[in-house]
């Protein structure tokens, strides 16, 4: 195979301006060089040494890897080279970097006021470039722009200390647009796990230099106002063993839909994040919001309203009270603490959301429902990531409300992610839902982090809980990842092999693919996904044991009894972004017309004892609706530190049921909106 060469593009950008009393490290060949020419001599000798020694690993050649990796290294006060950090997902590439630097000779260290000091540098390495390209770069003297000397003494270098969260145990806010970037780098790694979200900053920072990614977007500003508006956290307080940031947040939107509804959202928020020491991090977010949405969203929000007189429940957010005469007021509070005592285990406790899966949707656990209290343990060792998740849920329907108090229920999840090989990942999922029947409260039988929940459910009474099982697969190619999920609620082999479509064969399937840098276009991301879930999946014959929370499904937003195909495209260029999405689907609803009260299997909250039929059940049965949703959004990142975005979007939705009802009317609507938003969670309006 043709030998590939590397080009080292050396850029010198000093963090501290050097005076005449400060001196670069000196190779032996540079000892007679004038002090003004020492930087150039140092870079030239280092570049020559690395290029002559470096050999690209075979697997990198085979995959035709084309990236620039940043090597953070130092020349210590004794004159020895040491590698501090390499932002490459390839283990072999990291090992080669360490090997090459170990061959470098001991040199004279940098001097400051005639004292030897450690000096740190950033060394970008582009792979691959041919010899001619390499020589051109050297001749152009781009060398003078590359090395970034740093006089920091941190255990781990941070190229911009304005973002301390990047090395913390905080969660990265789960937004699909941002996570598509992280997925790219994580999928390049041989032993990463991508299903359980949100990710922790310190874990992702092993595979992608988060500071470098954010620094690409920094605007040169000299005024305090310009820095805070466009680049930085509003307030950053740091001490020797702690730090915290305080940022205001907004979600300000105005728009109009074709049903002549003037839409708006007015959210004011406060985001506080911080850490005490290296192992303990905390976060709190409070939102005060008023809004009126497109007509179909308002109708859905009112259809799932809670008992107690409040007019609506905003999907994904929470219970809303009336605002003026035709809008909603919906406060939301989220907070958690995160503790990582060692490299293996992370503990989190708080109020928020979780997501399990590699797809746009999840058949296991999604972020479609309102926030809830949770306790989570993530354990990473060898090729395994094992997640334990316990959640406290509630049912807000009037038939389960007693003296104004909503009915409580509990949920426990095990998810085991195993990297079978460099390319194949298998995930095993199980969950159980139970309530406080017989005043048992939170059942300690489900606290065991390793037990099979089916056995535990049987030991506490077969009707005392609802257990689901799942299997996920992911296979990684060069820039493509293939993924799937299978969820099993109930199953009888004798009924499955027949053609009678028994109601109790309750399962769902997802298959999908992601394509990063599609067609060799940098930052173009494509995704295709298909989901199908049989009638009555996630439902139960006990009112409170369904797979739902606050009148919202916990898995797929559509509940069950549907087929769906999704296509997604995302593109970014500097601070600009564009997202497009189309959704085709067919779903069966209940009729809810006052005469037919049967469950057709699409509403996870409808008691399946009231099913329409034992046999002959197929996807889309009942009041069948064809659904098409097209969505386009373009925008600009105003501040990358807080993910503040200016955007405009248009959504087209065609909803065509066989029998229009007050709750599910036949609609053909277009919704146009513009806004300014701190993008830290997903709005899920594609239903």
Residue map of PLM features:
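Outer-membrane beta-barrel channel domains
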Residues: 156-425, 432-436, 500-507, 514, ...
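Residue-level preference for beta-strand/loop junctions
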Residues: 65-67, 117-119, 264, 329, ...
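A mature extracytoplasmic/lumenal domain signature
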Residues: 73, 85-88, 123, 129, ...
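Charge-biased low-complexity segments
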Residues: 5-6, 18-149
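Generic short beta-strand segments
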Residues: 105-106, 248-254, 650-653
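Exposed, low-structure sequence patches enriched in small/polar residues
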Residues: 239, 330, 424-687
């Amino acid at each position: 195979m043709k030998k590939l060469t590397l080009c080292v593009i050396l850029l010198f950008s000093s963090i501290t301006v050097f005076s005449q009393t400060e001196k670069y490290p000196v190779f032996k060949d540079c000892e007679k060089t004038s002090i003004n020419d020492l930087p150039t001599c140092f870079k030239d000798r280092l570049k020559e040494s690395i290029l002559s020694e470096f050999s690209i690993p075979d697997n990198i050649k085979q995959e035709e890897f084309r990236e620039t990796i940043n090597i953070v290294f130092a020349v210590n006060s004794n004159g020895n080279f040491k590698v501090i950090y390499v932002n490459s997902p390839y283990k072999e590439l990291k090992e080669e970097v360490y090997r090459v630097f170990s061959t470098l000779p001991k040199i004279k260290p940098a001097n400051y006021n005639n004292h030897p000091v450690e000096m740190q540098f950033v060394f970008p390495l582009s792979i691959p470039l041919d010899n001619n390209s390499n020589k051109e770069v050297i001749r152009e003297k781009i060398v003078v722009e590359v090395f970034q000397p740093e006089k920091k003494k941190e255990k781990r270098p941070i190229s911009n200390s304005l973002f301390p969260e990047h090395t913390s145990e905080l969660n990265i806010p789960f937004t699909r647009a941002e996570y598509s970037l992280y997925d790219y780098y994580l999928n390049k790694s041989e032993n990463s796990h991508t299903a359980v979200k949100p990710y922790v900053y310190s874990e992702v920072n092993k595979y992608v230099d988060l500071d470098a990614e954010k620094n690409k977007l920094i605007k040169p500003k000299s005024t305090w106002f310009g820095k805070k508006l466009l680049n930085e956290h509003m307030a950053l307080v740091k001490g020797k063993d702690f730090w915290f940031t305080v940022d205001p947040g907004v979600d300000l939107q105005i728009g109009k839909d074709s049903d002549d509804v003037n839409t708006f959202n007015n959210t004011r928020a406060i985001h506080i994040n911080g850490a005490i020491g290296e192992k303990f991090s905390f976060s709190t977010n409070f939102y005060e919001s008023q809004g009126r949405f497109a007509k179909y969203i308002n109708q859905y929000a009112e259809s799932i309203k809670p008992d107690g007189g409040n007019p609506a429940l905003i999907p994904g957010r929470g219970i809303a009270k009336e605002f003026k005469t035709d809008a909603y007021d919906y406060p939301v509070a989220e907070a958690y603490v995160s503790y990582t005592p060692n490299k293996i285990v992370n503990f989190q406790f708080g109020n928020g959301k979780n997501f399990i899966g590699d797809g746009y949707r999840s058949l296991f656990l999604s972020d479609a429902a309102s926030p809830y209290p949770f306790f989570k343990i993530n354990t990473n060792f060898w090729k395994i990531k094992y997640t334990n998740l316990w959640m406290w849920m509630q049912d807000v329907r009037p038939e389960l409300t007693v003296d104004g108090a909503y009915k409580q229920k509990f949920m426990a999840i095990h998810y085991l992610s195993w990297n079978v090989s460099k390319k194949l990942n298998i995930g095993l999922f199980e969950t159980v839902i139970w309530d406080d029947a017989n005043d048992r409260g939170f059942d300690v039988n489900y606290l065991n982090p390793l037990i099979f929940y089916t056995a535990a459910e049987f030991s506490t009474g077969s009707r005392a809980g609802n257990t689901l099982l799942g299997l996920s697969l992911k296979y990684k190619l060069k820039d493509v990842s293939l993924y799937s999920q299978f969820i099993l609620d109930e199953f009888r082999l004798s009924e499955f092999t027949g053609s009678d479509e028994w109601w109790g064969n309750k399962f769902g399937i997802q298959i999908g693919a992601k394509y990063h840098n599609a067609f060799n276009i940098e930052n173009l991301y494509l995704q295709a996904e298909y989901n199908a879930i049989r009638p009555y999946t996630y439902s139960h014959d006990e009112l409170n044991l369904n797979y739902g929370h606050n009148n919202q499904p916990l898995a797929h937003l559509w509940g069950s009894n549907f087929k769906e195909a999704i296509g997604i495209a995302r593109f970014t260029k500097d601070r600009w972004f564009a997202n497009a999405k189309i959704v085709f689907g067919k779903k069966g609803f209940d009729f809810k017309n006052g005469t037919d009260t049967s469950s057709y299997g699409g509403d996870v909250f409808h008691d399946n004892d009231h099913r329409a039929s034992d046999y002959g059940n197929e996807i889309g049965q009942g009041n069948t609706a064809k659904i098409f949703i097209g969505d386009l959004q373009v925008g600009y990142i105003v501040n990358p530190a807080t993910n503040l975005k200016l955007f405009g979007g248009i959504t087209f939705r065609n909803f065509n049921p066989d029998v229009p009802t007050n709750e599910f009317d036949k609609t053909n609507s277009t919704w146009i909106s513009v806004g300014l938003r701190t993008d830290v969670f997903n709005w899920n309006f594609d239903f």
